[in-house]
Design a protein with these regions (language model features):
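Class I S-adenosyl-L-methionine-dependent methyltransferase catalytic core
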Residues: 1-189
Length: 189
């Protein structure tokens, strides 16, 4: 974690703003270098796109997406103190594109069924939540999913890995739903 308890937004409207990180042992804010790589993979700007930050944590990915022009960013967080920190920062910067949802990530997917252009998945490593998330994640051709985990993850068809890298103890990957595999995973048709 950042020693000062803050992580900075790299580019866009909120560039240079520092997101306060709640003092929670399980929070691992995505480092600047990894976020820079991710947004290079995504094409830097997310103008007009709908994004989901399913395990929001520090909010680094969701706030960065909003800063880079995403039309809508839904950030889901279950921890009350972390959620409160996200709310305060959203109000401070006036990020109208961000919708905060307090609750369980898997329950959100069961209820919402909304499709997003870009999904950020950085669950606590010990939860092993990725298989369940991918089973429930509504996708469509072109949907991109960023995964941050302790080890590389393979979700299977219709998801195709576009990029993969490693930074220290973290593996990060970018997947895309490909239309040549119509039918998809259970619950994603």
């Amino acid at each position: 974690m950042n020693p000062r308890g803050k992580v900075r937004i790299i580019a866009g409207e909120y560039r240079g703003r520092r997101i306060p990180v709640a003092p929670k042992p399980d929070l691992r804010p995505t480092p600047d270098r990894v976020r820079e790589t991710l947004f290079n993979w995504l094409g830097q700007w997310l103008d007009g796109l709908a994004c989901l930050d399913l395990f929001a944590g520090s909010g680094a990915l969701g706030f960065e997406a909003a800063s880079r022009g995403a039309a809508r960013v839904v950030m889901v967080e279950s921890d009350a103190a972390v959620f409160e920190s996200l709310e305060k920062f959203r109000s401070l910067i006036g990020a109208q594109a961000i919708e905060l949802v307090r609750g369980d990530a898997l329950e959100y997917l069961k209820r919402s069924r909304e499709r997003f252009d870009v999904v950020f998945l950085d669950p606590p490593f010990r939860q092993n939540a990725l298989p369940d998330v991918f089973r429930q994640l509504p996708g469509a051709p072109g949907t991109r999913v960023y995964v941050e985990a302790g080890e590389p993850f393979t979700p299977g068809a219709p998801w195709h890995e576009l990029k993969r890298a490693r930074a220290g103890q973290v593996s990060y990957q970018l997947f895309e739903w490909r239309s040549d595999d119509q039918g998809g995973l259970p619950g994603n048709v």
